[in-house]
Amino acid sequence: MQIKLANPRGFCAGVDRAIEIVNRALEVFGPPIYVRHEVVHNKFVVEDLRNRGAIFVEELDQVPDDVIVIFSAHGVSQAVRSEAAGRGLKVFDATCPLVTKVHIEVARYSRDGRECILIGHAGHPEVEGTMGQYDASNGGAIYLVEDEKDVAELQVRNPERLAFVTQTTLSMDDTSRVIDALRTRFPAIGGPRKDDICYATQNRQDAVKQLADECDVVLVVGSPNSSNSNRLRELAERMATPAYLIDGAEDLQRSWFDGVERIGITAGASAPEVLVRGVIQQLQAWGATGADELAGREENITFSMPKELRVRSLL
């Protein structure tokens, strides 16, 4: 058995920044540091930060007064921001800047009196935060659609004053079909100048397609609640390549590799490389050889830290 590695894979710039914000806050201010929602959707990362003194909560009413709170990479609604400000909580915002871009678009549509359609998955924290940027007090509305069926059933108030945005971690192929359905049903609909699906999601989906084309089975390292990791598994499966989503080496089953010659490995944007290395080691212990990276797109994007943490960390 030969191992092939997708390129790129694993951490993106937004995840790197979010984890570093929690780490630096712990270094500068000391524990406990409260984090609203898992800062990124990866069990290993969250457990490591928890062991260092981060406390993860789902709502601000679980946070005591006079503590530091970090908003996760997925972003929060305006209501959550107002609640934190009203309580005087000290907040560091780890929202991915590419998610913030979508938030700004939604807020602009709201101010302009345009209804907004969000393409995304119900219940995902990014979707909840994005929908919470729309102020419906002026009579507008924001709608959530997941697929073409939702588009066909959607009733809007004014199809001439309509715009769409998307969750950043969706399948590019699925989203393209939904956008086509929206443009067919609502010809006047507006949208972002550039696709809202982030560069890291696009790059990892392109890479897993190449991997699935060259391998007999694909392993996606990522947690079950990671949207982008699930999309990678789905993409490989659509190419008729068996694919498994695993948190790490402990989830591997030897029977998956019966009769397999080429094993492909990728990782979601919130999965650290140490987990990939653990998977490689286990496969090599079972007789697999090599760990060759496929040619891929180089990523050199970085996002700046909040000023206070950046300055303090240099003292």
Swiss-Prot record:
Gene Ontology process terms (BP): dimethylallyl diphosphate biosynthetic process; isopentenyl diphosphate biosynthetic process, methylerythritol 4-phosphate pathway; terpenoid biosynthetic process
Cofactor note: Binds 1 [4Fe-4S] cluster per subunit.
Function: Catalyzes the conversion of 1-hydroxy-2-methyl-2-(E)-butenyl 4-diphosphate (HMBPP) into a mixture of isopentenyl diphosphate (IPP) and dimethylallyl diphosphate (DMAPP). Acts in the terminal step of the DOXP/MEP pathway for isoprenoid precursor biosynthesis.
Key words, A-Z: 4Fe-4S, Iron, Iron-sulfur, Isoprene biosynthesis, Metal-binding, Oxidoreductase
Family membership noted in the UniProt record: Belongs to the IspH family.
Gene it is expressed from: ispH
GO molecular function: 4 iron, 4 sulfur cluster binding; 4-hydroxy-3-methylbut-2-enyl diphosphate reductase activity; metal ion binding
Protein species of origin: Pseudomonas fluorescens (strain ATCC BAA-477 / NRRL B-23932 / Pf-5)
Record PANTHER family: 4-HYDROXY-3-METHYLBUT-2-ENYL DIPHOSPHATE REDUCTASE
Lineage, uppermost ranks: Bacteria, Pseudomonadati, Pseudomonadota, Gammaproteobacteria, Pseudomonadales
Name by which UniProt lists this protein: 4-hydroxy-3-methylbut-2-enyl diphosphate reductase
Active-site annotation: E126
Residues annotated to bind isopentenyl diphosphate: H41, H74, H124, S226, S227, N228, S270
Any Pfam family hit: LYTB
